[in-house]
């Protein structure tokens, strides 16, 4: 006799639900088709047919989905959650207040911060070797290789393969005169690919320090980095980068060797020879190490040793070298301890496309390597990233808001073409939001198959964990992504000076609009900012961070270090935060880049830009103001996929460039921005008075964005100086 809790009963129930799902999905697809073209033979008017069919659709969907997959019962202070994800802590009390007013994660059992995930992985050197053991020398790094038949599957190298290559490269560094120890910096100037990781772990074998050079730092910044870090050797991925560095050899006396990951040209050989720089391929470098007879014992780094100097291109001024130790990077990976339901294991695969010079990417990869997971690289071309993701079918996806915003805009532009689709889509989102509020994360329900399946399949159909950060993500976009993906989607907040993240949202927490709770390796306090009327007594102020994740200072720059880390060890981020009633952090403003208008009002342009990006027409914006002016203006890059069809419906046709020059189009965009701003609670002085529509996107390539996709405000001001001056000249 079977009981309701027996496996046989559950198996039967799952099978019945699956069959019902299949039948009803087909039924409702037929209803959707019917609504798109209601029959003229019916005695009922078309709108009645549509309403009845829509009601049947939603009713059946609700009935089938009701209560499905709710497998737990977890109570906190009288509130019960019945989803399949157990809340890590009480969702209504996610942080604990210490006597000094600072906060730590409620996940911690005492007041001691957590320094690492695993006892046997306290450095990155130890971490990858732990992964090799746990995976039993499983696949580690993959790249797509094109076959004769045109297919391009991922081809994998094992942990031992990569460690052997790293061994040879590290020995080759010795052959080329690179000293052992933390005083020697190795430069790398390349897109994400296996050789990047090989170089990184080769660097750690003898406690050297890896210094990434961003692709678009510009020549002046690159020269500064090479000289300040006294870099002797740079690993480049292509001829163009190597050639670019050689142009400035006379300004970089320390540069002695260039290694290129592709075949050398005769021109490059001749140029490098004339400048006294050795040049060889990455294959040559590996062979040099493999054939070397002198193979000294490794000098593994300690947790306190530097792992990397990560130069922040910054939105202003000269690059600053953020010194991060092995302990720092390992401690930031502790945030992954939050994920008990969706934690990374040896069976996981991650897609790597965010720049490896970006610490968010490196932290997540370091955790993958600690547990024996595998990482597949995109082909270096963002235009075919979707194809790479579909081929890899990753389970872990780090992503930036810009990618998710584009996905949302694309889906919504399609959904808005049909009243029925919009009704069904909104209902599905609402239902899923209710389900998620109960900590129920699923992708096998009725609406998952009917409405969201294509979106999931666009990411390969296997994603379990999606991590986003680096910029704010609007509430509606985050809720959409969580509903559509049917997996754990978390948002983090931080900066390079605290490695990557100092807060991360709890898995299963569906409440959007915050950036999560303090990670276990950090503590946070809010400090008064009286000029902006933010006070700690009101649970608001500048976000200050302390703990194992705080950087050791700016390389060879004690003055800026002292300006950023106070005497008690608190990192002052320049961001304004507010504690929510649930004990999570919400970023509400920016202390940096604030300016005062002529009437004395302070303005935080980044806050305004983050609101305007919610306008359906806006892809990017740059809000500008001056101390001698009374109002704000903005440069706006419209979303081409939304603007063109929307204007056609209004009877305005033309190319994207032509539309950007059309005054009627400008008015439509400005009106929508002002409506969004008003709804978000912007004061009148925070609303822009005029805009210029630019058909040129802000990008890393045109030097208007940092590699972490933040606006370079001085560059934008210079780039659009003519348009800004003209707008102010026309205003009364």
Where are these regions (language model features)?
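Structural core segment of the AMP-binding/adenylate-forming
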Residues: 2-4, 13, 22-96, 205-287, ...
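ANL superfamily adenylate-forming
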Residues: 65-76, 151, 240-303, 411-454
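Gly/Ser/Thr-rich phosphate-binding loop
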Residues: 78, 277-282, 395-398, 408-511
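Conserved AMP-binding/adenylate-forming core of the ANL superfamily
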Residues: 116-119, 137-201, 218-223, 281-283
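Conserved pre-ATP/AMP-binding loop-to-beta segment of ANL
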Residues: 136-139, 278-280, 287-311, 318, ...
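Conserved AMP-binding A3 loop
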Residues: 156-160, 307-333
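Conserved AMP-binding/adenylation subdomain of ANL enzymes
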Residues: 330-352, 356-449, 462, 484
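Conserved ATP-binding/catalytic segment of the ANL
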Residues: 529-538, 542-597
